[in-house]
């Protein structure tokens, strides 16, 4: 995807961002991964903060509520929308009231099996 630099939209999606978005697309309804889980799943390189940056820029195109902090909380300011998705998908919760918290022990998704190549 290419975009002129002055159009005011997000920057073009690079390989790392594309990989993050692919992982998020693969998270099943009712399950979650933390920013760190995604970074670890993708292997050496960028960490949780870089995953967070990708989600901040491009996350609206994917099921962003399935990517949360390691303590089970959604991105700041998104509790009320995220909890509606969690309840609709049957995501295990520790608290449906602010501060919303997902039960990471039950809801964490390990990712798709990877080729041992």
Segments predicted by a language model, with ranges:
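Nucleic acid-binding interface residues in structured DNA/RNA-binding domains
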Residues: 2-117
